[in-house]
From Swiss-Prot:
Details of cofactor binding: Binds 1 zinc ion.
Keywords: Metal-binding, Zinc
Matching Pfam families: YacG
Family, as annotated: Belongs to the DNA gyrase inhibitor YacG family.
Organism name: Neisseria meningitidis serogroup C / serotype 2a (strain ATCC 700532 / DSM 15464 / FAM18)
Domain of life (superkingdom): Bacteria
Known cofactor(s): Zn(2+)
Function text: Inhibits all the catalytic activities of DNA gyrase by preventing its interaction with DNA. Acts by binding directly to the C-terminal domain of GyrB, which probably disrupts DNA binding by the gyrase.
Name of this protein: DNA gyrase inhibitor YacG
Length: 69
């Protein structure tokens, strides 16, 4: 099947919102360019983005529990 016959998936660049065709030849996907990719990386490095997680409290371990068995 040729590319013109296939449905081409388009996504928006997370940085500049430009339409980007999702294909293996696009080395920067989902970004439109190296510049947008680096801007996003800089945002992560600056702490602008975070990944939330639920922290579970660890069970208390007493000294007898830590003894070798």
């Amino acid at each position: 099947m040729t590319e013109s016959r296939q449905t081409r998936l388009q996504v928006k660049c997370p940085t500049c919102q430009t339409a980007v065709v999702w294909k293996p030849e696009n080395a920067f996907r989902p970004f439109c360019s190296q510049r947008c990719k680096l801007i996003d990386l800089g945002g992560w490095a600056d702490g602008k983005y975070t990944v939330s997680s639920q922290t579970e409290s660890l069970p208390e371990i007493s000294e007898p529990d830590m003894a070798y068995r």
